[in-house]
């Protein structure tokens, strides 16, 4: 506490205060390390869950996309996550997890007038600190739905198979709170996992079709 009289601290008292300061630093560092470990374990758990679903669902992409959306929202500390897949000239909503209703159309034209569309067209991540403040000028197509939903911070990453964009994964927050570099890196990993899963299902189906053809030819 504070002293009202002027009397210097003794060397022992100074040493004791230094010890308390060191202990505080150690405690803070311990909390940081514990949180990092918890985050790391959550990420590993999410990855192993996704791999498990891929293994259990080799011919059906839906359970995999649902799991990836749920994991992305949870691990990246977002209010929701959605995955859209390119289907002809539209981006079709394929999976959504989170309490925010999706007022945006289930199918969005592939152009720069929506966040997901722009991420796909430009083949790069789009990170917007406050979507609500720029939607009128930047993303007119989804202005009405953005205002209805109250979306603030948004991050979209394209799903790239080799050099071809095949869809997007997007996470949102209902407050202005940009995603950290770590969360951005994690969403890219989830995007990669989605691409692997989609490719896996495609190959499995192809293999099944070839086996059927082979069986018919042998009969």
Language-model-detected regions and their locations in the chain:
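Signal-transducing coupling segments at domain and membrane junctions
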Residues: 2-3, 90-92, 99-105, 129-153, ...
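GAF sensory/regulatory domain recognition
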Residues: 69-73, 81-112, 132
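Acidic/proline- and glycine-rich, intrinsically disordered low-complexity segments
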Residues: 102-126, 142
